[in-house]
Amino acid sequence: MEELQRYFKMDRSQKRDFLYPLLFQEYIYALAHDFGLTKLIPYESMQILSYENKYSSLIVKRLIIRMYQQKHLIIFDNDSKKKKFLGHNKNLYSQMISEGFAXIVKIPFALRLVSSYQGKEIEKSINLGSIHSTFPFLEDKFVHLNHVLDVLIPYPIHFELLVQNLRCWIQDASFLHLLRFFLYEYHNWNSFTTQKMKQNSLFFKENRRFFLFLYNFHVYESESIFLFLRKKSYHLRSISSIAFLDRTHFFGKIEHLKVVFRNDFHTMLWLFKDPFMHYFRYQGKSIMSSKGTPLLMKKWKYYLVNLWECHFYFWSQPNRIHINQLSNHFLNFLGYLSSVRPNPSVVRNQMLENAFIIDIAINKLNTLVPIIPLIGSLAKAKFCNLSGQSISKPAWTDSLDSDIIERFGRICRNFSHYYSGSSKKKPLYRIKYILRLSCARTLARKHKSTVRSFLKRLGSEFLEEFLIEEELVLSFILPKISSSSHRLSKERIWYFDIIRINDLMNL
């Protein structure tokens, strides 16, 4: 117990007070705006993300003056169902304040991150944030494991629990009251779930950084137990997450946890200690895999459910955690269908004058392109119908031919870039064919011609726009194998510069 006390004891000097006055500083909004422009999702314009013409020093000064003069942030007009936020410009001002709020609230976390690494050598790498960096890890680890827990991240019963947890990091009462105001004003706590986010995507994009911070903090809370468990395991090392996991509430409710499990805490940890347990997460889903028995995985399942409900007060159910065998289950994660399958091979063994043929099977991680969901995403974006037949994009016919080809080519290269690590490339070729034919139909519709006559007139240059840039990049990265296009098409290539998934790939 003394070890737990030392481990979960929080350094009070790391808390930062008086963050609320920063909302009245002009440079905060300038920093938030500049950061937003540099962190846009690839292939999405500023108009889509609502950043166009939304910032100027005059608007910021006007906002700050209103904040000084306003006694109450919410003003009710004659219609009690409608609210005015800081005057008439509700959407603009609320978005600016939420962006500034998100930039300020990260200060305590950033200071703690810097202080936690003082005096330590930190390995510099630009690839730590890449989505593709997860798959080489899976290739090395998953082939030796048996079972996987497919977990949906739980969410709190009420957003007030999140505000209470933030009090461990932020002591400014005014700042916390402002957080409550935002959550009550928008009634948007349910949008923390992935499905609700997609349904209310426009509102979420306008307040993207604010809600992403709250959601990420909520996830860090639910994962804080793994920071302690990794000390008891050989393979749960995660240095990069050490500064973001809260430690106070876990020790504060340890007695309640004892009553639930009716056992000594050290004994409970020993029961679930597993040197072959691996954990990783992206968005609202997390994966835990182990080499243990099905009984051990069931223990992990109910341990997590009880821990989240009794310690963190997160709503969760056993049916949100699925136990599957890696050998006969496809894992839908990060836009890929991944599975572990035996890869048979024949080895010729020569001993003196005798030769032996040995059949062996080595487990290999297969990463496949989910063709059906991707076609559904393309159909939703009006590139094809649900059966995969290409259709034209009437909304793009007003653009120049070069712009239309460039937009289709950019989407096509984006797919090729992300799914370059697929074990089988045929589904990817089908997606590229749908996009190329959709581009041809769009151009033919614009020029009031048939697809066949238009392709005949355009010639091979049409295909080069889709293929030549990708081939040049690969030949530069892999000059030794670029001479053989057949061999290159079979190679799995992981890129370490992908930090986001395009909307069409976000399945």
From Swiss-Prot:
Where in or outside the cell it occurs: the entry states: Plastid, Chloroplast
Q: Which Pfam families match?
A: Intron_maturas2 (PF01348), MatK_N (PF01824)
Molecular function (GO) terms for this protein are:
RNA binding
| InterPro entries for this protein | Domain_X, Maturase_MatK, Maturase_MatK_N
Which cysteines in this chain are paired by disulphide bridges? none
**Which domain of life, per UniProt?**
Eukaryota
Which keywords does UniProt give here? Chloroplast, mRNA processing, Plastid, RNA-binding, tRNA processing
Q: Name one GO biological process term.
A: mRNA processing
Q: Does the keyword Magnesium apply?
A: no
What would be one Gene Ontology cellular-component term for the protein? chloroplast
Signal peptide start-end: none
HAMAP family, alphabetically?
MatK
Family statement drawn from the similarity comment of this UniProt entry:
Belongs to the intron maturase 2 family. MatK subfamily.
Function description? Usually encoded in the trnK tRNA gene intron. Probably assists in splicing its own and other chloroplast group II introns.
Recorded protein name is Maturase K
> Which organism is the protein's source?
Ranunculus acris
